[in-house]
Amino acid sequence: MIRIAIDCMGGDFGLPVTIPAAIEFARQFPDTRLLLVGLPDAIEAALAERRDAPRDRLDIVPATEVVSMDDPVEVALRRKKDSSMRLAAQAVKDGRADACISAGNTGAWMAISRYVLKTLDGIDRPAIATSIPNQTGRATTVLDLGANVDCSAEHLLQFAIMGAALSQAVDHRDRPTVGLLNIGEEIIKGNEVVKEAAELLRASPLNFYGNVEGNDIFKGTVDVVVCDGFVGNVVLKSVEGLAKMLSSVIREEFKRNFITLLAGAFAKPVLNRLRNRVDNRRYNGAALLGLRGVVIKSHGSADAYAFGFALQRAREAVASKLLERTAQTVAQITQRVQSGEAVAPGAAGDTA
């Protein structure tokens, strides 16, 4: 039985999203048990509205406090010690849950998770990773997406190790290719940190492709794209904004007149397939990698449909033993890097 602790109070909408998503998820996956962490009376009231809730696999974990989207990290971490967010992470720490998930304040969730669970040996900083759909029909894993604004070359190497482990475990890629996000493919491009990181990656046992550019994320050039949190967050928000704009523009154009409405009716099957491929809700659920526990961050504005996919990401991470595989991969590669063992000739490429 896979056990997932949910911060039911987190996010822009809280219970109206988390409870319906939890119920649908529990019905879809009978091998899971969900710990619903939050204000008990409010959770009971929300569950009472759904007669189809599998109550035998929905356990309420009472909390007396809620971390709001506006709470400073210090307040969430130091003052609200009985918050639903804190207790969700604590459930993993205590072994009562295999994974935890929140749609709440990203900074607070990262700080609380790191404080409660600690980082893996060999990892200095956790990183946020998610999947972005590409033209191959698969997805590109991108990290870091905002946890670390300023990074050293060693941090980027650690992100690459964790991203490769995630791609292997969840996306089932035997030897994922890793690219370093840069302003050009050439070796001479980028700032000093990026150049140094490229050298470390080139000398590592990872399947390092070389420098990649922003368009390579959507082309599916590599399986994993590594960058610092500042750049990664800009990329993520740009992708989300572009997707919403294109969806809005397409709807407006098909509603322009009778001819376009008719064309839209004929094109509906194609448009539905396109929407399913690029719908960012289907890729909701970013993994906080590098911690001693499976931690998932849902988008704060996620609806119940999107939150359900974040729960699936948590389940997949546990089922694929992501934590164990990440720890093992980090230990193995860190040892090989420290011993000066380079990648075998021809195992990794470089486009420069």
Swiss-Prot record:
The keyword Phosphoprotein does not apply. Keywords: Cytoplasm, Lipid biosynthesis, Lipid metabolism, Phospholipid biosynthesis, Phospholipid metabolism, Transferase. It holds the Pfam family FA_synthesis. SUPFAM superfamilies: Isocitrate/Isopropylmalate dehydrogenase-like (SSF53659). GO terms for biological process: fatty acid biosynthetic process; phospholipid biosynthetic process. Coiled coil: none annotated. Pathway: Lipid metabolism; phospholipid metabolism. It is found in: Cytoplasm. One of its GO terms (cellular component) is cytoplasm. Its EC number is 2.3.1.274. It catalyses: a fatty acyl-[ACP] + phosphate = an acyl phosphate + holo-[ACP]. It is an enzyme of class 2 (transferase). GO terms for molecular function: phosphate:acyl-[acyl carrier protein] acyltransferase activity. Catalyzes the reversible formation of acyl-phosphate (acyl-PO(4)) from acyl-[acyl-carrier-protein] (acyl-ACP). This enzyme utilizes acyl-ACP as fatty acyl donor, but not acyl-CoA. NCBIfam families: plsX. Belongs to the PlsX family. Homodimer. Probably interacts with PlsY. PANTHER family: FATTY ACID/PHOSPHOLIPID SYNTHESIS PROTEIN PLSX, PHOSPHATE ACYLTRANSFERASE. This is Phosphate acyltransferase. It comes from Bordetella parapertussis (strain 12822 / ATCC BAA-587 / NCTC 13253). The gene is plsX.
